[in-house]
């Protein structure tokens, strides 16, 4: 049985080095999809590069933890910027859900303005869309707009029922991440999904060239290792041998 494999590179628009890495991994590797931060400092550069890479499926990376929001969010920002304190607010059940709903709609419209089309799917920076308070908002929005949604099913148990018409991959893995990146690790992710019986799988990745912005990230040099692995000459053949075909959320 042929299985669908979506190799999605996060952080499109974060920096020029990140953008170039994603394009390289698409053009000369196995990356088929990406998610863009519409408030990223290099989003205009990402849009420009994407025009020469029409095969790259582009989704929207909903951002609530970095940079400036597009709408007024006094309940979530500090000094006008977003940050990781969202986790504390979630634990205190103090998230400003109406503000988050408005920001989601604004980022979505901004994506369409930038790229001239709807995103192929939705995802979020640091997976905040999987918070139990936020997930129903994002799932309902994706279903209403007819776009797919990345779902990490491990924390999903307390998030309620899914909308009937919501599209997603059957499996998702964030395991291709960390200090021990290798081709063997990537293939192990596929083998694990096969053993679970997943008919479709999204694998998250972050291929990049190193620039000053990426140097400031806690996850820096492994991004370059990811790029090496994802453009390996042997990897595409090994994927096909395992019964996977490369695709995107357009195929879900």
Swiss-Prot record:
The processes (GO biological process) annotated in the record are: chitin catabolic process; diacetylchitobiose catabolic process; polysaccharide catabolic process
| EC number, as in UniProt | 3.5.1.105
Superkingdom, natural source: Bacteria
Q: Which residues bind Mg(2+)?
A: 125
Catalysed reaction(s) here are: N,N'-diacetylchitobiose + H2O = N-acetyl-beta-D-glucosaminyl-(1->4)-D-glucosamine + acetate; diacetylchitobiose-6'-phosphate + H2O = N'-monoacetylchitobiose-6'-phosphate + acetate
| Name of the protein in question | Chitooligosaccharide deacetylase
Q: How does it assemble?
A: Homodimer.
- Please give the SUPFAM superfamilies that the UniProt record associates with this protein: Glycoside hydrolase/deacetylase
Main subcellular location of this protein, as a coarse class: cytoplasm
- Please name the gene that encodes this protein: chbG
One CC-aspect GO term: cytoplasm
Instruction: Establish whether keyword rRNA-binding is in the entry.
Output: no
Transmembrane region(s) = none
Pathway stated in the Swiss-Prot or TrEMBL entry: Glycan degradation; chitin degradation
The entry sums up its family as follows:
Belongs to the YdjC deacetylase family. ChbG subfamily.
- Names of the cofactor(s): Mg(2+)
Indicate where this protein resides in the cell.
Answer: Cytoplasm
Kindly indicate whether the keyword Magnesium belongs to this entry.
Answer: yes
| Free-text function comment from the UniProt entry | Involved in the degradation of chitin. ChbG is essential for growth on the acetylated chitooligosaccharides chitobiose and chitotriose but is dispensable for growth on cellobiose and chitosan dimer, the deacetylated form of chitobiose. Deacetylation of chitobiose-6-P and chitotriose-6-P is necessary for both the activation of the chb promoter by the regulatory protein ChbR and the hydrolysis of phosphorylated beta-glucosides by the phospho-beta-glucosidase ChbF.
Q: Name one GO molecular function term.
A: metal ion binding
Keyword vocabulary terms for this entry? Carbohydrate metabolism, Chitin degradation, Cytoplasm, Hydrolase, Magnesium, Metal-binding, Polysaccharide degradation
């Amino acid at each position: 049985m042929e299985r669908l494999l979506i190799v999605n590179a996060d952080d499109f628009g974060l920096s020029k080095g990140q953008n170039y890495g994603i394009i390289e991994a698409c053009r000369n590797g196995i990356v088929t999809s990406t998610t863009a931060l519409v408030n990223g400092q290099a989003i205009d550069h990402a849009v420009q590069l994407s025009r020469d890479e029409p095969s790259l499926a582009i989704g929207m990376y909903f951002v609530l933890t970095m940079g400036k929001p597009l709408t007024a969010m006094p309940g979530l920002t500090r000094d006008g910027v977003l940050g990781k304190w969202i986790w504390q607010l979630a634990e205190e059940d103090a998230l400003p859900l109406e503000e988050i709903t408005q920001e989601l709609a604004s980022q979505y419209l901004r994506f369409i303005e930038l790229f001239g089309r709807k995103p192929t799917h939705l995802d979020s920076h640091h997976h905040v869309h999987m918070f139990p308070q936020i997930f129903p908002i994002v799932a309902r929005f994706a279903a209403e707009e007819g776009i797919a949604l990345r779902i990490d099913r491990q924390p999903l148990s307390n998030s309620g029922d899914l909308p009937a018409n919501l599209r997603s991959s059957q499996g998702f893995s964030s395991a291709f991440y960390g200090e021990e990146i290798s081709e063997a690790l990537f293939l192990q992710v596929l083998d694990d999904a096969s053993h679970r019986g997943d008919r479709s799988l999204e694998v998250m990745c972050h291929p990049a060239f190193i620039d000053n912005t990426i140097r400031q990230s806690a996850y820096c040099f492994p991004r370059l290792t990811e790029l090496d692995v994802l453009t390996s000459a042997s990897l595409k053949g090994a994927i096909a041998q395992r019964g996977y075909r490369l695709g995107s959320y357009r195929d879900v």
